[in-house]
């Protein structure tokens, strides 16, 4: 576990988190989504931000998430936790739920937090936060990332 966390901090580009935190202040509507294990990170970040007065939308039901994405406007920031990248890939969940079509037509700014390098190539994803993982102990890495995002948000709020 220690090796995984050390690897994360030594190889992670924090400037991507700085952009995300900036956008938390910029956008009036924020949604944070994920499914399965990635939903844990989404929920944790949402709870932390709400505790500091930043209201964020989050749905556990995947279809509710897709409906939100489909109707999001340009004043909306969507953060998707998907360690595998399947949430946003054309060959992933899109086969069944048309996520590709919804994301491609969305007017929202979309961030994806993932370990999948291929997500960077998707034109309908505006920003990618790549998470370095060494041994697939991503639950620990996910917690470190959520804590880092929240600490940077707190730090900017206090200034």
Question: What residues fall within each predicted segment?
Answer:
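Glycine-rich phosphate-binding loops that contact phosphosugars or nucleotide phosphates
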Residues: 25-158
């Amino acid at each position: 576990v220690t090796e995984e966390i050390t690897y994360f901090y030594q190889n992670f580009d924090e400037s991507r988190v700085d952009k995300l935190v900036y956008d938390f202040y910029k956008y009036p509507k924020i949604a944070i989504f994920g499914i399965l294990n990635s939903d844990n990170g989404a929920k944790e970040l949402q709870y932390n931000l709400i505790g500091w007065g930043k209201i964020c939308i989050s749905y556990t039901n995947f279809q509710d998430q897709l409906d939100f994405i489909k109707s999001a406007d340009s004043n909306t920031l969507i953060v998707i936790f998907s360690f595998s990248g399947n949430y946003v890939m054309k060959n992933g969940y899109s086969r069944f739920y048309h996520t590709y079509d919804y994301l491609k037509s969305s007017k929202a700014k979309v961030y994806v937090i993932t370990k999948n390098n291929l997500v960077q190539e998707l034109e309908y994803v505006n920003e990618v936060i790549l998470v370095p993982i060494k041994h697939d102990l991503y639950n620990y890495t996910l917690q470190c990332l959520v804590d880092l995002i929240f600490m940077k948000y707190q730090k900017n709020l206090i200034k």
